[in-house]
Amino acid sequence: VYESYTEKNKTRMAISFILTIALLGIPFYGHGASSIVIGILVIAALGLYLAPNIQTKIKEKWRISARTMNTALLCTMMIVIGYSSYALIVIRSTANTPMDQNSPEDIFTLGEYLGREQYGTRPLFYGPAFSSKVALDVKDGYCIPRQSEAGSKFVRKEKTSPDEKDSYIELPGRVEYEYAQNMLFPRMYSSSHAPLYKQWVDIKGYDVPYDQCGEMVMVNMPTQWENIKFFFSYQLNFMYWRYFMWNFAGRQNDIQGSGEIEHGNWITGIPFIDNLLVGNQELLPQDLKNNKGHNVFYCLPLILGLIGLFWQAYHSQRGIQQFWVVFFLFFMTGIAIVLYLNQTPAQPRERDYAYAGSFYAFAIWVGMGVAGIIRMLRDYAKMQELPAAVLASVLCLFVPIQIAGQTWDDHDRSGRFVARDFGQNY
């Protein structure tokens, strides 16, 4: 970073850049000897391309400037700093703390831990439905379940004495079965949750013939439309937009729900809207009406965020460019996670924490909503900039005041010292 920043010597600058990329292992893609060959070829090609005498001979638009190198190295440094936080997992596991799930004490168990291998695999783009049957192959007169390539993995060998050197052994990898019936974008894939899928979607399905060791049986598969309906009704609406509206419209209570109209839904605090959504809230028992998690924002943060969204998108050319940055932050930390997790019904806990980044992104638009209101006051009320800014700030100040007033009781940590005491004792 220093060499590319000072730009005193182009040779040293190129060497430092190549060494950084090489030492991070970026060019060494693959496994075994092939990764070494690929890495050497990539480093050699990069060194040839960045050589000062080559850079002076090629067209200016193809040259790598010191600024580009510096930016690339800074980005790489930020990535390394971010990934270095994973070292805490290994350090903590090595200390053998009471809670040490999967004991990720070496590079192999750390990979399994980060890959969430203890939770199994979930199909994302193509795979089985909850009613799919394992494909069968006939071998020597027997029906054998068809398995995919399992590969292998390395695990640490248990020591027989403290003086024994560390060693690792190779074991067969995870066994994956192949299914005879598959579908695109499978959202209802878990055979353990079949009754729960049917609670969320009225599944009629369609029959598919299946050869079960010479016996032809019919397997009822959900249709693609039923699959999409579950995606929208449960995974998107219940497991994302419900949490989103908790933060920007209002929350019924903090009791975990599974789709009931009295537990954990989003509300607005506006009676006629809430009556349409979840029924008359005045008919709820007192313990639910007085729940500390009952928070109403009257959709004010949501409205302010939408104003900020449209103001940024239509403000100028620079505004639309900034809008796409915030939008992709909002999407990748929200809906993209929904697509990746492919969650089943009856989760053990509310999962709103998984989408906190998406809510932070929308909060950026909430802040920009103030600028949008200032622009509206100037354009439609013909106000001067300073009076418009003062009036918009005063009006919008009621939004965070309402949020704080509603959520203070269910977020008050006064007198709670368990977390601090555990940390101090440890």
State where each predicted segment sits.
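Hydrophobic/aromatic-rich transmembrane helices and adjacent perimembrane loops
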Residues: 335, 347-372
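Lumenal/periplasmic acceptor-binding loop at the mouth of the active site in multi-pass
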Residues: 93-309
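Signature aromatic-anchored transmembrane alpha helix within multi-pass, membrane-resident enzymes
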Residues: 18-21, 71-80, 313, 368-404
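Membrane-interface junctions at the ends of membrane-embedded or membrane-associated helices
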Residues: 2-11, 50-63, 315-319, 363-389
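Membrane-proximal, lumen/periplasm-facing interface regions of secretory-pathway glyco-
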Residues: 352, 389-426
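Membrane-interface catalytic loops of GT-C/OST-like multi-pass glycosylation enzymes that act
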Residues: 6-7, 11, 28-41, 92-96, ...
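Membrane-interfacial loop-to-transmembrane alpha-helix junctions, especially the N-terminal start
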Residues: 7-18, 67-75, 316-330, 385-391
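Transmembrane alpha-helix segments characteristic
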Residues: 75-81, 297-304, 317-340
